[in-house]
Amino acid sequence: MLLTTERLVLRRFRAADAPALAAYRSDEETARYQSWVPPFTLARAEDFVVQMAGREPDAPGWFQWAVELTSQRVLIGDVGVGLHDNLMQADLGFTFAPAYRGQGYATEAVRAVLDRVFTVQGVRRVSAECDARNEASARLLERVGFTREGRQRSSTWLKGEWTDDLLFGLLSEDWPPGAP
Protein backbone atom coordinates (compact mmCIF):
# COMPACT_ATOMS: atom_id res chain seq x y z
CA MET A 1 0.00 0.00 0.00
CA LEU A 2 1.71 3.16 -1.24
CA LEU A 3 0.79 6.75 -1.93
CA THR A 4 3.25 8.79 -3.94
CA THR A 5 3.64 12.50 -4.51
CA GLU A 6 6.25 14.55 -6.32
CA ARG A 7 8.69 14.29 -3.40
CA LEU A 8 7.25 11.72 -1.01
CA VAL A 9 6.25 8.10 -0.56
CA LEU A 10 3.58 7.36 2.04
CA ARG A 11 3.67 3.73 3.11
CA ARG A 12 3.28 1.32 5.99
CA PHE A 13 5.74 1.62 8.83
CA ARG A 14 8.69 -0.80 8.81
CA ALA A 15 10.81 -2.07 11.69
CA ALA A 16 13.72 0.01 10.36
CA ASP A 17 11.65 3.19 10.92
CA ALA A 18 11.62 2.86 14.71
CA PRO A 19 14.84 4.83 15.42
CA ALA A 20 13.77 7.82 13.27
CA LEU A 21 10.24 7.72 14.74
CA ALA A 22 11.66 7.69 18.27
CA ALA A 23 14.00 10.57 17.42
CA TYR A 24 11.46 13.01 16.00
CA ARG A 25 8.76 12.14 18.52
CA SER A 26 11.30 12.69 21.33
CA ASP A 27 11.94 16.25 20.21
CA GLU A 28 10.53 18.67 22.83
CA GLU A 29 9.06 21.07 20.26
CA THR A 30 7.48 18.21 18.29
CA ALA A 31 5.86 16.82 21.43
CA ARG A 32 4.79 20.23 22.77
CA TYR A 33 1.18 20.01 21.52
CA GLN A 34 0.95 16.21 21.44
CA SER A 35 -0.40 13.82 24.06
CA TRP A 36 2.91 12.04 24.66
CA VAL A 37 5.72 13.19 26.93
CA PRO A 38 9.28 12.86 25.62
CA PRO A 39 11.35 10.86 25.42
CA PHE A 40 9.52 8.65 22.94
CA THR A 41 11.72 5.62 23.55
CA LEU A 42 12.98 3.22 20.93
CA ALA A 43 10.97 0.45 22.61
CA ARG A 44 7.82 2.56 22.37
CA ALA A 45 8.54 3.30 18.71
CA GLU A 46 9.09 -0.40 18.01
CA ASP A 47 5.75 -1.22 19.68
CA PHE A 48 4.05 1.49 17.61
CA VAL A 49 5.49 0.06 14.38
CA VAL A 50 4.24 -3.43 15.32
CA GLN A 51 0.76 -2.07 16.11
CA MET A 52 0.56 -0.26 12.79
CA ALA A 53 1.69 -3.37 10.88
CA GLY A 54 -1.55 -5.10 11.87
CA ARG A 55 -3.85 -2.29 10.73
CA GLU A 56 -5.49 -1.54 7.40
CA PRO A 57 -6.22 1.97 6.08
CA ASP A 58 -9.74 0.98 4.98
CA ALA A 59 -10.74 -0.59 8.32
CA PRO A 60 -12.16 1.31 11.29
CA GLY A 61 -9.55 2.63 13.70
CA TRP A 62 -6.30 4.53 13.34
CA PHE A 63 -3.86 3.91 10.51
CA GLN A 64 -0.59 5.84 10.44
CA TRP A 65 1.11 6.48 7.11
CA ALA A 66 4.90 6.62 7.30
CA VAL A 67 6.10 9.59 5.23
CA GLU A 68 9.40 9.01 3.44
CA LEU A 69 11.36 11.64 1.55
CA THR A 70 11.99 10.01 -1.82
CA SER A 71 15.31 11.73 -2.54
CA GLN A 72 16.90 10.67 0.75
CA ARG A 73 14.87 7.52 1.53
CA VAL A 74 14.41 8.67 5.13
CA LEU A 75 11.36 8.78 7.39
CA ILE A 76 10.40 12.43 7.93
CA GLY A 77 7.00 12.13 9.61
CA ASP A 78 3.65 10.43 9.76
CA VAL A 79 0.03 11.16 8.91
CA GLY A 80 -2.72 9.33 10.78
CA VAL A 81 -6.33 8.71 9.81
CA GLY A 82 -8.84 7.48 12.37
CA LEU A 83 -11.66 5.94 10.35
CA HIS A 84 -14.96 5.80 12.24
CA ASP A 85 -16.99 2.58 12.44
CA ASN A 86 -19.51 3.94 9.92
CA LEU A 87 -16.69 4.30 7.32
CA MET A 88 -18.08 7.72 6.36
CA GLN A 89 -16.20 9.89 8.86
CA ALA A 90 -12.56 10.14 9.82
CA ASP A 91 -10.18 12.11 12.02
CA LEU A 92 -6.78 13.33 10.85
CA GLY A 93 -3.48 13.97 12.61
CA PHE A 94 0.14 14.50 11.58
CA THR A 95 3.63 14.75 13.06
CA PHE A 96 6.82 15.75 11.23
CA ALA A 97 10.49 15.83 12.16
CA PRO A 98 11.81 19.34 12.93
CA ALA A 99 14.37 19.33 10.10
CA TYR A 100 11.61 18.81 7.53
CA ARG A 101 9.11 21.43 8.65
CA GLY A 102 8.45 24.60 6.68
CA GLN A 103 9.28 22.99 3.33
CA GLY A 104 5.79 21.92 2.28
CA TYR A 105 6.27 18.21 3.01
CA ALA A 106 3.47 18.03 5.58
CA THR A 107 1.08 19.85 3.25
CA GLU A 108 2.00 17.50 0.40
CA ALA A 109 1.55 14.39 2.56
CA VAL A 110 -1.74 15.52 4.09
CA ARG A 111 -3.14 16.34 0.64
CA ALA A 112 -2.21 12.86 -0.62
CA VAL A 113 -3.89 11.19 2.35
CA LEU A 114 -7.01 13.35 2.04
CA ASP A 115 -7.24 12.59 -1.66
CA ARG A 116 -7.22 8.86 -0.90
CA VAL A 117 -9.71 9.23 1.95
CA PHE A 118 -12.21 11.11 -0.20
CA THR A 119 -11.74 9.58 -3.66
CA VAL A 120 -10.83 5.96 -2.86
CA GLN A 121 -12.46 5.34 0.51
CA GLY A 122 -15.52 7.52 -0.10
CA VAL A 123 -15.41 9.23 3.29
CA ARG A 124 -17.92 12.07 3.65
CA ARG A 125 -16.27 14.14 6.40
CA VAL A 126 -12.78 14.47 7.88
CA SER A 127 -12.31 16.26 11.19
CA ALA A 128 -9.13 17.57 12.76
CA GLU A 129 -8.27 19.48 15.88
CA CYS A 130 -5.18 21.11 17.22
CA ASP A 131 -4.04 23.01 20.27
CA ALA A 132 -5.02 26.65 19.74
CA ARG A 133 -1.39 27.67 20.28
CA ASN A 134 -0.23 25.42 17.42
CA GLU A 135 -0.48 28.05 14.70
CA ALA A 136 1.52 26.05 12.15
CA SER A 137 -0.89 23.10 12.28
CA ALA A 138 -3.91 25.41 12.07
CA ARG A 139 -2.43 27.10 8.99
CA LEU A 140 -1.69 23.75 7.36
CA LEU A 141 -5.26 22.54 7.91
CA GLU A 142 -6.70 25.70 6.38
CA ARG A 143 -4.20 25.55 3.49
CA VAL A 144 -5.39 22.06 2.49
CA GLY A 145 -9.05 23.10 2.58
CA PHE A 146 -10.32 22.59 6.12
CA THR A 147 -12.79 25.07 7.56
CA ARG A 148 -12.20 26.28 11.11
CA GLU A 149 -15.48 25.33 12.78
CA GLY A 150 -14.90 26.34 16.34
CA ARG A 151 -12.84 26.59 19.47
CA GLN A 152 -13.33 24.49 22.56
CA ARG A 153 -12.20 26.41 25.59
CA SER A 154 -10.17 24.56 28.22
CA SER A 155 -11.08 21.27 26.59
CA THR A 156 -7.88 19.27 26.99
CA TRP A 157 -5.74 18.68 30.07
CA LEU A 158 -2.26 18.58 28.54
CA LYS A 159 1.01 18.43 30.41
CA GLY A 160 -0.28 20.11 33.54
CA GLU A 161 -2.54 22.76 32.03
CA TRP A 162 -5.92 23.21 30.37
CA THR A 163 -5.64 24.04 26.70
CA ASP A 164 -8.08 25.29 24.08
CA ASP A 165 -8.60 23.21 20.94
CA LEU A 166 -9.38 24.50 17.45
CA LEU A 167 -11.86 22.34 15.53
CA PHE A 168 -11.71 21.86 11.77
CA GLY A 169 -13.82 20.02 9.22
CA LEU A 170 -13.58 19.14 5.54
CA LEU A 171 -16.44 17.65 3.51
CA SER A 172 -16.14 15.46 0.43
CA GLU A 173 -18.01 18.01 -1.71
CA ASP A 174 -15.32 20.57 -0.84
CA TRP A 175 -12.52 18.28 -2.05
CA PRO A 176 -10.32 19.14 -3.77
CA PRO A 177 -10.27 22.77 -2.68
CA GLY A 178 -11.20 25.11 -5.49
CA ALA A 179 -13.06 22.43 -7.47
CA PRO A 180 -16.25 23.62 -9.23
Spans of features found by a protein language model:
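Short, contiguous, well-ordered secondary-structure segments
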Residues: 81-83, 106-107, 114, 132, ...
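Hydrophobic alpha-helical segments typical of transmembrane helices
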Residues: 17-20, 109, 113, 151
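GNAT-family acyltransferases
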Residues: 1-99, 116, 120, 159-180
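Conserved acetyl-CoA-binding loop-helix of GNAT-fold acetyltransferases
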Residues: 94-96, 102-119, 135-143
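Conserved catalytic-core motifs of GNAT/GCN5-like acyltransferases
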Residues: 13, 127-129, 147-163
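Catalytic tyrosine of NAD(P)H-dependent dehydrogenase/reductases that use a Tyr as the general acid/base
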Residues: 103, 130, 168
